[in-house]
Amino acid sequence: MRVLGIETSCDETGIAIYDDQQGLLANQLYSQVKLHADYGGVVPELASRDHVRKTVPLIQAALKEAGLTAKDIDAVAYTAGPGLVGALLVGATVGRSLAFAWNVPAIPVHHMEGHLLAPMLEDNPPAFPFVALLVSGGHTQLISVTGIGQYELLGESIDDAAGEAFDKTAKLLGLDYPGGPMLSKMAAQGTEGRFVFPRPMTDRPGLDFSFSGLKTFAANTIRNNGDDEQTRADIARAFEDAVVDTLMIKCRRALEQTGFKRLVMAGGVSANRTLRAKLAEMMQKRGGEVFYARPEFCTDNGAMIAYAGMVRLQTGAKAELGVTVRPRWPLAELPAA
């Protein structure tokens, strides 16, 4: 079975083809970072228009990369939510139209389920059950995963997501959009311990997160300690350490609560090297395992959508006859396979 995956939930146009026997056959990605950089964030209307321009050419490029034609595609999977409504509608409309023209099923995919399943694309995929840390610009969640569609929300951010906090703090430090990766690069040059940021909500029970206060703490620290290059690097280091420690503490609690031995980390922030190293060290001490996707599959991409669509189709998902998107779509509402 070969599935064409279409991802257009935000500011990346991702197209991929996944074969259940041969694996990933094609992966095309276009990023709109330069388009939105002057605005300091994603402009929804510009994002939608750029998806219109790029989606079909990238599908053609993916078919060429795989050496396939439309007749070789058995299903089309597209991101139906959550995300920006205009951007989602582009991918959904193209996906549903192609499926109709090619007479194959059209499978709507939950964007965060795509992220959650992305580590399954690797050579050593995680087995169920596991705790999943979904950590990105729009989401920070801990999920108990016992099977496809068997998701229990354990905790989530009550305000800013971790990735959003990274980007906002990076802007305070004078870094360009998207600032998260640049902040991490700056943090690598910082002095450990010069500044100590709080670890939000770790002094009380529960698995929820709160990161908005770290941005305020960073703003006050910047204002009170000057703006030379080393000070900015030290502040970046303190901020990153606080976020990573907070995520690690909550992951440990989730593992203790569930009794699971496997931790899956997914989403754009899961590419953070410090976070990967800290969680790997923690899981080694606990006698467990941590799993994550390669960096290019941590951020938005078509490969995870193609794979998630294939899994859903194989487990009995019904093809969509209409074009429907859900900008807000709780993961827990997905049906169990």
Swiss-Prot record:
Pfam families assigned to the protein according to its UniProt record, in alphabetical order: TsaD
Highest rank taxon of the organism: Bacteria
InterPro entries with a match to the protein in the record: ATPase_NBD, Gcp-like_dom, KAE1/TsaD, Peptidase_M22_CS, TsaD
CDD domains (UniProt xref): ASKHA_NBD_TsaD_bac
Major localization class: cytoplasm
Catalytic activity as recorded in UniProt: L-threonylcarbamoyladenylate + adenosine(37) in tRNA = N(6)-L-threonylcarbamoyladenosine(37) in tRNA + AMP + H(+)
Swiss-Prot/TrEMBL cofactor(s): Fe(2+)
GO biological process, one term: tRNA threonylcarbamoyladenosine modification
Gene Ontology CC annotations of this record: cytoplasm
PROSITE patterns linked: GLYCOPROTEASE
Compartment(s): Cytoplasm
Keyword entries, A-Z: Acyltransferase, Cytoplasm, Iron, Metal-binding, Transferase, tRNA processing
EC number: 2.3.1.234
Function: Required for the formation of a threonylcarbamoyl group on adenosine at position 37 (t(6)A37) in tRNAs that read codons beginning with adenine. Is involved in the transfer of the threonylcarbamoyl moiety of threonylcarbamoyl-AMP (TC-AMP) to the N6 group of A37, together with TsaE and TsaB. TsaD likely plays a direct catalytic role in this reaction.
Name the UniProt record assigns to this protein: tRNA N6-adenosine threonylcarbamoyltransferase
